[in-house]
């Protein structure tokens, strides 16, 4: 690789790493969770954007180079709206915009095709859906599954956002990630508060 290409890659990695640490705080630390549901949803949205940024999907998951990342929030429209706001502020990730859709937990099975065609599904408690139902629905797909409790990864989910007092961090299930045919950056997995084998 020519020196200028290496320099560009290093600068890009440095910028992405800086952005990651600005969102997550220092390595090994969680991000302070602002008070209020909307603020917490924005922090969760920042995590979701960065999970997309640091995850590799099989190339076949995209019909074209312009196809957006599709994030589905199983939960309230308020949570989906906050995630949508953060995604818009983040701008394109790897040249793709992020489209955020909301699915009500009552209609989970009817929305099966939308969920299975997405890249990331965030199961928020406000959706009233059991972790097991969502995970079973997404079996055999290349969809990054993220929940909002540690029980989500114990049930077979890939990542879960967890609050510890005023801070938000995450836990990971590397086995479920590999089983889903995805690769989450090892640097990200090292930042997880816990990993479930």
Over which residues does each language-model region extend?
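Short hydrophobic alpha-helices and adjacent helix-cap/hinge residues
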Residues: 2-197
